[in-house]
Structures are given as C-alpha cells and as structure tokens.
Design a protein with these regions (language model features):
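Periplasmic/cell-envelope proteins involved in peptidoglycan metabolism and beta-lactam response
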Residues: 1-222, 229, 233-238, 243, ...
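Beta-lactam-recognizing serine transpeptidase/beta-lactamase-like catalytic domain environment
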Residues: 7, 96, 159-160, 201-243, ...
C-alpha cells in the first residue's frame, strides 16, 4: 500500500507528460490518425489511475476529519508521530478566557494544561496510548477542526497535506472559573472529596472539583492508584448525604403546612420494635462526657433545622408520608442523570442519585431516608443543583458548562414562597446553628451541614450553601470523605470558596442581558 501511495504522483506525472507529448505530435500531423487499440487502452488506464489518485487524494486531504481514518493511521502508520500531532488542537478556555488547555508543539508539548491538575477531571486529557476523556473527548472534532462544512475541511486539510502546515482547531469556552478551580484544589489537597458551584440564576457551572487529582501527562500511574484519582467524584461519586438531605424534607413540610412542634426526647425515636433508636448528636456528645442530656423537647421545623435534629426529621418523615416525600424528591429529579455538556463527539453527564422506593416501604425506610441515611446515595453535583433551585426562588435552570449555551429554564420544583421560607431557615443555620463557621467568609449565606454515617470508616463531612443570602449568585456543595462532622471539614472549605468567588466577581449582579458566561 505504501508503494502505491508514493508511486501515484509519479505515475500521474508520467501520464500527464505522455498526453501532452502525444497531443503535440497529433497537432503537427497533417493526416488525422484514427484511434487504435493502444489509444483506447491508454485512455482506460489513465481513467483508472485518475480514479485511484482521486480516491487517495480525498483521504489525504480530508481523511483526518474521520475518526475511523485517524484510528487506522494511528495503528498502522509507520511514522513515529501520532496523526493527532499534525493537528494543532484548539484551546479550552474558562469564563474569563484564561487558557485551561492548549497545544505547544514547538516546545515539545502536544498538550499543555496551565492550571493542572486543578481541572483535570472535567478538562480531561489527550494521550497517545490512553486516548481522550473529558471535554477533550466530548468536543474532539471541534477542537481538532474536524467540525464544520466540507469545503472548510478540504481547505484546511489540503493546506496541511500539500504545504505540510499545522491544522488549526477551534477553541472551546467553558463557564468554569479557572481560579476557583485552583482554590478548590488547594482546599481539597491531601483529601478525598469534591466541590461543585453553580450560578442559580443561569445554571452556569462555575466549579467542578474532585480530589485526589492526577497528572494529565502521566496517566498510567493514576490508573493504578488505590485512591482512585481518575474518578470524577463531583459528577459520579455517590455518598450518603446525611443531614444535608433534610432540606428536601423541610421543603415538603413547608409546602404541606406541617412545620409545627414535634417532641424530641433524649432517648430518641425508634422506627419499630427491636430497631435501635435514632438519636440527636447532642446525646452522644453528652454521653462521652458522662453527662445526662435532657433532649430538645417540643421544637418546630425552624429549630430542628438549626440544630439538625435527627429525632425531629425521623418523626417528620412518617408524618409527611411516603407519597409526599416521593413527590418532593421527584420534583428535584435526583434520580435522573444530568447532561452538562454536549459536544461534537459526545456529552458529559452527571450520574443519577439512588433513592429507595418509599411507596409501601416500612417506617424504618421512611425515617432513614428522612435523615439522609439508609439506601440514599447522592452526588455532590445533584446536591449543588438542589440548593441552586432553593436559591433561585424555586426555579430550575438547565446546568451547563458550555459558555455558548443560552440559559434555559426547565421547571419550578418549588413555589417562590416555599423557596423563600426555606432560604430563611438555612440562613439561620449559618447565623445560629451548625453552619456558623460559614460566617468566616465575610459574605452572608444560608446552608445546611451534614455528617453522613459511613459503614466503611469515619463519617463523611458535608455542607451545602448559597450566597449572598439576599440575592444568591452561587450554590455550593462540598463533601470530604471521612471528614467527620460537616462543621469541622466541609464548612471551612465552603467558606473559603465563597470568599474566593466574591473576590473573582462571581457574586456580582448579572449584566442587563440577564446572562453571564
């Protein structure tokens, strides 16, 4: 095959010269020469050679826009260079046009990631052996210049093959803030967990951080790391949410008008005969110190959320009933995967959360679900998205990381009044309750802590929040694996992220157009 591709231009040149000489001889001959068998044979041979040459030229000029051709050349070409190295991939940029990925072939760097490893999971990588992932994969054709009209392809690849020029790809602009990604990487350093930030006013995703991180140019070692750095915990990590899940029960209670007093005795609440009681964290704290705790007594929803009372919400679940709980959870679409980016070659989708079937379930399932334990598993992204709904007066915008996407209102899971009431309760959690550490950010906020029991080890630390309290511009979810109390590990990280978001202008009012990249 190789001799054929190399010999075609030579054969074509010989044929062209032969036709030119023959035409010149015939034009100088006074007597017409009738076509003979040799002339017909040469014409057929010429037509065949031209057809082969045209077929080969079409592959050379436009083949690289075909993924099958690229794969074929990568496997069978004897050249030491990967075909992709002949392509100057477009850049991946953040909302401020800061470069998150670019090609630097002259410096010996086919792909360079200036903010690495801060956004490694979402930006992805390009590797000659392991392929592509993340945005690099989902938008492959766009980044390599293979998307667009056929005329554009032919012109671009014709220039590459005939003049040996570099094929220039197209840029991709994201809604992420690279500086916030770097701050999240610093805050999560040495830990396992994730942080997600969404603009509730538009659905634009500002932060998708997962830890531990990996080196985008050294993929092999990361794949065998027992800490699973290749796992995108922000989108695909499933965790019991603990007390952060109480925001859904609170929303259902507000909507149903069941926010009154429930007795929360020190001995707790048992969901059935022979089952261990569900107790409040103060009971265990006092027990460790050898003191007797009197319990919360009769408290309402506001106090229960501020104090994060497990007993209150464990009893609230059966009081609301399976149907009411199911309806509220369905409104937030927790069990549906969410597509965040649709590119030229694929999409990026957040994993769906897992919830038990509540209809017909025993009381113990309702109580465990009400406090975010049992069979409940959620992703950090889904929790950030839920808080964004509360922050946006009950409206749910389509989450996206493509800066070219126009904000799209999907639904309204909550009424404006329910969302407003719940926000006020979450603000009290920060000013009076378990989320007081959030005040260190210097920005007013509302939130909810969570300490999720983990059968495999220490409890997971959660915190979800929105800020500023008066006009929410960002919704955040943070989880730290084995971090203990939410107020201990997750809250300080969320506070630092809100402070950084304020510094980077993410909390500023939207422009008059009503949208921002």
């Amino acid at each position: 095959m190789q001799w054929l591709t190399r010999g075609l231009p030579i054969l074509f040149a010989i044929l062209a010269a032969w036709f030119a000489i023959r035409q010149n001889v015939l034009s100088n001959t006074r007597k017409p020469v009738p076509p003979g068998p040799h002339s017909t044979l040469m014409r057929l041979l010429a037509i065949g050679m031209l057809a082969i040459f045209g077929y080969q030229a079409s592959w050379q000029l436009a083949g690289f826009r075909n993924a099958e051709f690229v794969a074929f050349m990568t496997r069978y070409s004897r050249r030491t260079a990967n075909p992709r190295e002949g392509l100057h991939r477009g850049r991946i940029l953040d909302r401020n046009m800061l470069i998150m990925a670019e090609s630097k072939p002259k410096e010996g760097r086919p792909r360079f990631y200036p903010f690495a490893p801060a956004a490694c999971h979402i930006v992805g990588y390009v590797h000659p052996k392991y392929g592509t992932v993340g945005i690099e994969r989902a938008n492959e054709a766009h980044l390599t210049g293979r998307s667009g009209s056929d005329v554009k392809h032919l012109r671009r690849f014709g220039q590459n093959m005939l003049r040996h020029g570099m094929v220039l790809g197209n840029d991709t602009v994201l809604t992420l803030d690279a500086r916030l990604q770097v701050e999240a990487a610093r805050l999560l350093s040495g830990q396992r967990g994730a942080a997600v930030a969404i603009d509730p006013r538009t659905g634009a995703i500002r932060l998708l951080a997962s830890a531990p991180y990996f080196n985008q140019n050294q993929i092999g070692s990361a794949m065998t790391d027992p800490a699973s750095p290749m796992l995108n915990r922000a989108l695909n990590g499933l965790y019991p949410p603990g007390s952060t899940f109480k925001i859904f029960l609170a929303a259902a209670a507000i909507q149903a008008g069941k926010t009154g007093g429930i007795d929360c005795p020190p001995e707790g609440y048992s969901p059935g005969p022979g089952l261990p009681p569900i107790r409040d964290h103060e009971y265990y704290e006092n027990e460790r110190e050898g003191r007797h705790w009197r319990g919360h007594g009769m408290i309402d929803l506001s106090t229960a959320l501020i104090k994060s009372s497990n007993v209150y919400f464990a009893r609230l679940g059966p009081l609301l009933g399976a149907q009411s709980m199911t309806d509220m959870l369905n409104r937030f679409e927790l069990t549906k995967g969410q597509t965040l980016f649709t590119g030229s070659d694929g999409s990026l989708t957040a994993k769906a959360s897992r919830l038990p079937t509540l209809t017909g379930a025993p009381t113990r399932v309702l109580t465990q679900t009400a406090i975010g334990q049992g069979e409940v598993l959620v992703t950090p992204f889904q929790m950030a998205r839920a808080v964004a709904v509360i922050a946006a007066d009950g409206r749910q915008f389509k989450p996206h990381i493509d800066a070219e996407v126009t904000p799209q209102l999907l639904s309204a899971p909550l009424s404006p009044q329910t969302a407003k009431t719940l926000r006020a309760l979450m603000v009290k959690v920060v000013t009076q309750g378990t989320g007081r550490g959030m005040m260190a950010s210097g920005v007013s906020a509302g939130g909810k802590t969570g300490t999720a029991q983990n059968p495999a080890g220490d409890d997971h630390s959660w915190f979800v929040c929105f800020a500023p309290a008066e006009r929410p511009a960002i919704a955040i979810a943070v989880v730290v694996e084995h971090g203990g109390y939410g107020s201990r590990s997750a809250v300080p990280i969320a506070a630092a992220l809100v402070q950084a978001a304020d510094q980077y202008g993410l909390l500023d009012p939207l422009p008059a157009s009503g949208s921002a990249k």
